[in-house]
Amino acid sequence: MFSLSGKTALVTGASGGIGAAIARQLHAQGATVVLSGTREAALQELADSLGERAHIAVANLSDPAEADGLVAKAEAVAGAPLDILVNNAGLTRDTLAIRMKDSDWSQVMTVDLESPFRLARAALKGMLRRRAGRIISIASVVGTTGNAGQANYAAAKAGIVGMSKSLAQEAGPRGVTVNVVAPGFIETPMTDVLPETVREKLIGSIPLGRMGNTGDVASAVVYLASDEAAWVTGTTLHVNGGMAMV
Amino acid sequence: MSDIADKVKKIVVEHLGVDESKVTPDASFIDDLGADSLDTVELVMAFEEAFSVEIPEDAAEKIATVKDAIDYIEKQKAA
């Protein structure tokens, strides 16, 4: 089950915690992975640790031209057409709306919403022709629930859901599926520094009684990327320990 | 047959996987050649690339037959 042998996957934001976990699990299922991000050394280190079937493609997704060109670049380094696109790269510029600068808004929109569209558009051209493909975008529970201090991020992540549903309708007749994974609170270096009382309160709001880990998110991506998920499209798979049942 | 007509025909055969004999000037992409709406968009994009022309959305909507495509591209190329 869930073999990705012979498939080629591009993972953006692969130098981050969740992105690296996604790349590792796709690779473990047999996929050839192209790791993308801005930090070349970190990407190379991950590629080296994976060994065979791992390539890197450095790209800064805040630059529209680099976003537009990344799929072609990934296919060139992998030497194969792209079967799986994982839009994982993202950034946050958290602050309350009344203090939010235009640049806080636009940077998040460009990287978290516009670049996934650019990548999906480029990937779809080949996928539609080949009548196969998987596009999986990483959103967030806050795209559904909202979150104080994240008007920009929540809007971008909600946008990912609407975009993916539209693309799923366009690409469905060609057997290409488009889905979203929406993580809740995931253990990362960022959440490690939270005070213990805040952590406890956070965990208290999660029925499954713990924070998520990056592997929880990666497993959901593997499922959606697999042949077994062939009849699942336009959906959002919430991976949040039951914190928000939507 | 003009070079443009020849090339259009070739693109249609390639993209829709239909027999060359079916690609007559009056053949409708959707009604006669089995194209769906996504096919027609892909065809228009293939024409744009092959002939280095831009086919705006409102013009693309009017291209229903092989002849429509040839006429439109010939007009663009002549302009």
UniProtKB/Swiss-Prot annotation, chain B:
| InterPro entries in the record | ACP, ACP-like_sf, PP-bd_ACP, Ppantetheine_attach_site
**List of residues that carry O-(pantetheine 4'-phosphoryl)serine:** S37
| Stored PROSITE patterns | CARRIER, PHOSPHOPANTETHEINE
Q: Where in the cell is it found?
A: Cytoplasm
Among the record's GO biological process terms, what is one? lipid A biosynthetic process
Q: Where is the Carrier domain?
A: 2-77
What does the PTM comment of the record read? 4'-phosphopantetheine is transferred from CoA to a specific serine of apo-ACP by AcpS. This modification is essential for activity because fatty acids are bound in thioester linkage to the sulfhydryl of the prosthetic group.
Quote the pathway field. Answer: Lipid metabolism; fatty acid biosynthesis
Signal peptide from the UniProt entry: none
Q: Which UniProt keywords apply?
A: Cytoplasm, Fatty acid biosynthesis, Fatty acid metabolism, Lipid biosynthesis, Lipid metabolism, Phosphopantetheine, Phosphoprotein
Any GO CC annotation of this UniProt entry: membrane
For this UniProt entry, the molecular function terms from Gene Ontology, in alphabetical order, are:
acyl binding; acyl carrier activity
Query: HAMAP family attached here?
Result: Acyl_carrier
Function noted in UniProt: Carrier of the growing fatty acid chain in fatty acid biosynthesis.
What does the similarity note say? Belongs to the acyl carrier protein (ACP) family.
Name of the featured protein: Acyl carrier protein
